């Protein structure tokens, strides 16, 4: 069986490895990024994920990547679309053009391929494109992967959602069940609109938890209370749970900001209060944190890491970047220095980058860190962070 994975991000790569572990499958990765293609063909992971990196060490010739669409789609049985769908602030909608471009190629080259969409899409999207392209062989199956743990979450999924109740949906469900490691996983077959809803509502619930515990922390800070003690007491209730409860500067990253905004857009003309509040509370929190930082009146403020979470290899839509922008908006004269080893340039957002940590620590009188790590221990008296449990969960 030949399976094409379109998009070499953490979702695409995790799915590629999942299917390639079965020797009956031929897996081809398709992307336009020649650096990622070269990395995979040289048996190196283009993303940071311990299990994925381990796979490349142990399975030298399992995966092949290409930018040649004809080569990729020739004789393929399935295509998994895992291309980015960023949120367009002007349109108030996901930018789904990458998916449609893939579907155009598939229809022109090999229209018999069964298409599985893993990219996050608006509610109602799958039905729309099936009509637009006159293709009945398109199924939406959302992913619930964490960046940094994408392969583990693919092998041991919390559940499998298939947005199709037909024979094709059952075939795709069996395809995943045959390749995952977890036994007795729940699999749900439903309408595509419902599967799309599961994805957006799931991430919006997680964003709601982040927002809730951030507001607990905001209250505690204003009243000089210990937020860690309060949160521990709240979370000890099994109905609430001891997860996703660590305060932060706000939620960021690739999924939660865009998915909450898309769900709110899907609520157009539907009475709602909570969904809107989840989006708003994140901006309120970032502004609140910015004011707390400015109240400390630092002469030189250090920004420790731009990454969205601990051990990430990127800072796409990172909350700390929003904090920087608010700082510059509220006080244009504030002097900032960034420590971020991932940035090789001397400046970022027109701010000096200092990647000698000792020099960085000596130059600044206050350091802000969305997440605290061991590197900061020796200068912890200089650090301002909302992180009370030292975890991303």
Curated annotation (Swiss-Prot):
It comes from Campylobacter jejuni subsp. jejuni serotype O:2 (strain ATCC 700819 / NCTC 11168). Transmembrane segments: none annotated. Its EC number is 1.1.1.22. It catalyses: UDP-alpha-D-glucose + 2 NAD(+) + H2O = UDP-alpha-D-glucuronate + 2 NADH + 3 H(+). Catalyzes the formation of UDP-glucuronic acid which is required for capsular polysaccharide synthesis. Does not catalyze the formation of glucuronamide moiety of the capsular polysaccharide. Coiled coil: none annotated. The gene is kfiD. Belongs to the UDP-glucose/GDP-mannose dehydrogenase family. One of its GO terms (molecular function) is UDP-glucose 6-dehydrogenase activity. GO terms for biological process: capsule polysaccharide biosynthetic process; UDP-glucuronate biosynthetic process. The keyword Repeat does not apply. NAD(+) binds at residues 11, 31, 36, 85, 120, 147, 254, 258, 316. This is UDP-glucose 6-dehydrogenase.
């Amino acid at each position: 069986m030949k399976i094409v994975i379109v998009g070499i991000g953490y979702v695409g790569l995790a799915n590629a490895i999942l299917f390639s572990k079965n020797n009956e499958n031929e897996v081809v990765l398709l992307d336009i990024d020649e650096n990622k293609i070269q990395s995979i063909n040289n048996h190196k992971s283009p993303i940071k994920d311990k299990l994925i990196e381990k796979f490349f060490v142990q399975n030298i010739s399992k995966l092949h990547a290409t930018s040649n669409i004809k080569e990729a789609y020739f004789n393929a049985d399935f295509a998994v679309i895992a291309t980015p769908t960023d949120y367009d602030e002007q349109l108030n909608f996901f930018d789904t053009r990458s998916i449609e471009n893939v579907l155009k190629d598939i229809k022109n080259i090999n229209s018999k391929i069964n298409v599985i969409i893993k990219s996050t899409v608006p509610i109602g999207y799958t039905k729309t494109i099936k009509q637009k392209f006159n293709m009945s062989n398109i199924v939406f199956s959302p992913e619930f992967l964490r960046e940094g743990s994408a392969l583990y979450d693919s092998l041991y999924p919390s559940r499998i959602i298939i947005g199709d109740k037909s024979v094709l949906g059952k075939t795709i469900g069996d395809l995943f069940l045959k390749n995952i490691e977890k036994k007795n996983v729940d699999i749900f077959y439903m309408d595509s609109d419902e599967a799309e809803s599961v994805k957006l509502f799931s991430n919006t619930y997680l964003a709601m938890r982040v927002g809730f515990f951030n507001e607990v922390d905001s209250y505690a800070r204003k009243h000089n209370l210990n937020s860690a003690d309060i949160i521990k007491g709240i979370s000890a209730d099994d109905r609430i749970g001891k997860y996703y409860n660590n305060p932060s500067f706000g939620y960021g990253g690739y999924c939660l900001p865009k998915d909450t905004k898309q769900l709110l857009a899907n609520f157009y003309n539907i009475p709602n209060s909570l969904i809107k509040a989840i989006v708003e509370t994140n901006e309120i929190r970032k502004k609140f944190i910015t004011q707390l930082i400015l109240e400390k009146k630092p002469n030189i403020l250090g920004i420790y890491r731009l990454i969205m979470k601990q051990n990430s290899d990127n800072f796409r839509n990172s909350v700390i970047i929003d904090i920087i922008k608010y700082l510059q908006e509220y006080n244009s004269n504030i002097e900032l220095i960034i420590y971020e080893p991932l940035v090789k340039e001397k400046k970022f957002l027109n701010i000096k980058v200092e990647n000698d940590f000792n020099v960085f620590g000596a130059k600044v009188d206050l350091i802000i860190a969305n997440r605290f790590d061991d590197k900061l221990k020796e200068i912890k008296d200089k650090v301002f962070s909302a992180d009370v449990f030292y975890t991303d969960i």
